[in-house]
């Protein structure tokens, strides 16, 4: 019994997230026969949880008179990356971004609108139903209508190459039966979502303390595409970066995404309120949360970090709304009407990340922090709040909120991460490059497997760039792979 219906396909796409699904559909729209592989039982991966994509000059922005210069974005992003990002890739991505928004609409995707995040521009095109609706209700059905064959619980385990390195096939394996099949193909597109969920790769390829890093993802980003490409002679490039998103609550008894949409997580980890380190000292302007990647970096400068909330600020956020949200999961300015109940439940359950006391001294003791230093830090901070001026780190007076009304709460913050980005060096056609900088004929990479979009820190001021690039690079690789296989077919005949 074979796994796939046929032994030969023009293109094999590995991964069914935004990049892989877009690649398969685009290739099919250009006349290619496509086999789409998903190693899990369910398709979409972490793209299911995405909220919207980046674009400039889209029809939605034009309707709202939102004008964002593509060249200004390019300069800002490349500068932000310390020139580790590829300006050519950004140029192509930007120039095609409005087309990508339109293409998704043409496939049946509906949008809520365009918005900004933090201090950024209004470039975030929020789609209805999140990524799950985009993939499962629009792109995947369209792809299957065009004949794309989808295999779930099936892994690509090795690439086959000619003597000159060109792709000639791929061996696939069933997760259920371990049965294998060799698929003849002239092109393989790798879109496997990075390696965040591979602890060994994270330890070897990044500088993050993985004990404090909490992957909030589908759990399937284990570096499969990178390993396949590296074994085929691809250049290892652009590894080391995870998309951090600030403080996150660690609860080993629950799945990591448990608190993603909770008001307690947003209150504890995403607000510009008081943070103390393992010495009971304040160490940063906490308004860094308005760039969630910078917030993750800041948290990593300390061995431990605790967010300190008093009853007054909890009441304020319940009545007046939060200072900062968490994407569309918890909206900015949203009234935190469930916050107290969520906190009370966590305290009652003795969750390991939360501490409650009626006095600052007792709270410090429960958090195992030096009482005198915690008391001094909070007294100094409260004086800054009274004065309306942060003499240490210059925090905006709007966010100087006193810690004075008991009971008091401490939340130990770890660092959340959505994905890694990078690993394979690619051309502007998303062709994978070998160790000499030459394309491996027939091998493409898209989405998080492809390097060139970032430096060591993700840029959230242009929200949606990661999934936007996934859709764009998936289409880009699918289109060029289809053109290449069509040429090969003409030559062979």
Swiss-Prot record:
Positions that bind FAD: 19, 38, 46, 50, 52, 156, 224, 448, 467
InterPro entries attached to this UniProt entry: FAD-dep_OxRdtase_2_FAD-bd, FAD-oxidoreductase_2, FAD/NAD-bd_sf, Succ_DH/fumarate_Rdtase_cat_sf
Keywords (A to Z) from UniProt: FAD, Flavoprotein, Oxidoreductase
EC number: 1.1.1.-
Cofactors that this protein relies on: FAD
Pfam short name (any one): FAD_binding_2
EC category name: oxidoreductase
Keyword presence, Oxidoreductase: yes
Chemical reaction(s) catalysed: 4-vinylphenol + NADH + H(+) = 4-ethylphenol + NAD(+); 3,4-dihydroxystyrene + NADH + H(+) = 4-ethylcatechol + NAD(+); 2-methoxy-4-vinylphenol + NADH + H(+) = 4-ethyl-2-methoxyphenol + NAD(+)
Molecular function per GO: steroid dehydrogenase activity, acting on the CH-CH group of donors
Phenotype seen when the gene is deleted: Mutant lacking this gene is unable to reduce 4-vinylphenol to 4-ethylphenol, while its ability to reduce hydroxycinnamic acid is not affected.
GO biological process entries: steroid metabolic process
Induction comment: Is up-regulated (four-fold) by 4-coumarate (4-hydroxycinnamate). Is also induced by its substrate, 4-vinylphenol.
Function: Involved in the production of ethylphenols during the degradation of hydroxycinnamic acids. Catalyzes the reduction of vinylphenols (4-vinylphenol (4-hydroxystyrene), 4-vinylcatechol (3,4-dihydroxystyrene), and 4-vinylguaiacol (2-methoxy-4-vinylphenol)) to their corresponding ethylphenols (4-ethylphenol, 4-ethylcatechol, and 4-ethylguaiacol, respectively) in the presence of NADH. These compounds are considered the most important flavor components of fermented soy sauce, and, on the other hand, are considered off flavor and responsible for sensorial wine and cider alteration.
Family: Belongs to the FAD-dependent oxidoreductase 2 family. FRD/SDH subfamily.
Protein name stated in the entry: Vinyl phenol reductase
Lineage, uppermost ranks: Bacteria, Bacillati, Bacillota, Bacilli, Lactobacillales
């Amino acid at each position: 019994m074979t796994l796939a219906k046929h032994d030969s396909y023009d293109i094999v796409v590995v991964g069914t997230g935004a990049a892989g699904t877009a690649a398969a559909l685009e290739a099919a729209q250009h006349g290619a026969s496509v086999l789409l592989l998903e190693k899990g039982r369910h398709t979409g991966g972490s793209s299911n949880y995405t909220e919207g994509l980046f674009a400039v000059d889209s029809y939605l922005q034009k309707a709202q008179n939102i004008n964002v210069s593509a060249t200004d974005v390019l300069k800002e992003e490349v500068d932000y990356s310390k020139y580790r990002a590829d300006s050519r890739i950004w140029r192509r991505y930007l120039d095609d971004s409005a087309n990508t928004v339109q293409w998704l609409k043409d496939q049946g995707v509906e949008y809520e609108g365009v918005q900004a995040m933090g201090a950024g521009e209004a470039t975030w095109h929020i789609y209805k139903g999140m990524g799950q609706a985009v993939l499962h209700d629009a792109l995947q059905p369209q792809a299957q209508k065009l004949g794309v064959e989808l295999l779930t619980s099936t892994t690509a385990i090795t690439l086959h190459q000619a003597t000159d390195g060109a792709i000639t096939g791929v061996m696939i394996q069933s997760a259920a039966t371990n049965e294998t099949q060799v698929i003849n193909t002239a092109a393989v597109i790798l879109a496997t979502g990075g390696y965040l969920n591979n602890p060994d790769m994270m330890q070897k390829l990044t500088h993050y303390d993985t004990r404090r890093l909490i992957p909030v993802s589908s759990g399937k980003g284990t570096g499969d595409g990178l390993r396949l490409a590296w074994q085929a002679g691809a250049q290892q490039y652009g590894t080391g970066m995870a998309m951090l998103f600030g403080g996150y609550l660690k609860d080993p008894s629950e799945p990591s995404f448990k608190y993603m949409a909770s008001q307690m997580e947003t209150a504890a980890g995403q607000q510009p309120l008081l943070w103390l380190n393992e010495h009971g000292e304040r160490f940063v302007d906490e308004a860094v949360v308005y760039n969630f990647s910078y917030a993750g970096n800041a948290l990593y400068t300390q061995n431990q970090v605790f967010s300190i909330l008093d009853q007054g600020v909890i009441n304020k956020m319940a009545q007046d709304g939060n200072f900062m949200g968490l994407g569309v999961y918890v909206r900015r300015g949203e009234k935190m009407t469930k916050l107290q109940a969520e906190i009370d439940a966590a305290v009652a359950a003795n969750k390991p990340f939360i501490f409650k006391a009626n006095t600052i001294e007792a709270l410090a003791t429960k958090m195992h922090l030096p009482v005198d230093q915690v008391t001094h830090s909070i007294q100094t901070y409260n004086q800054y709040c009274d004065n309306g001026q942060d003499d240490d780190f210059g925090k905006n007076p709007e966010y100087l909120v006193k810690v004075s009304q008991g009971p008091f709460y401490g939340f130990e913050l770890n660092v959340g991460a959505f994905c890694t980005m990078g690993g394979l060096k690619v051309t502007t056609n998303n062709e994978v490059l070998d160790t000499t900088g030459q394309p491996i004929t027939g091998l493409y990479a898209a989405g998080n497997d492809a390097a060139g979009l970032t430096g060591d820190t993700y840029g959230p001021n242009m929200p949606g760039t990661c999934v936007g690039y996934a859709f764009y690079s998936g289409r880009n690789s699918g289109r060029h792979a289809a053109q290449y296989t069509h040429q090969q077919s003409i030559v062979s005949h």
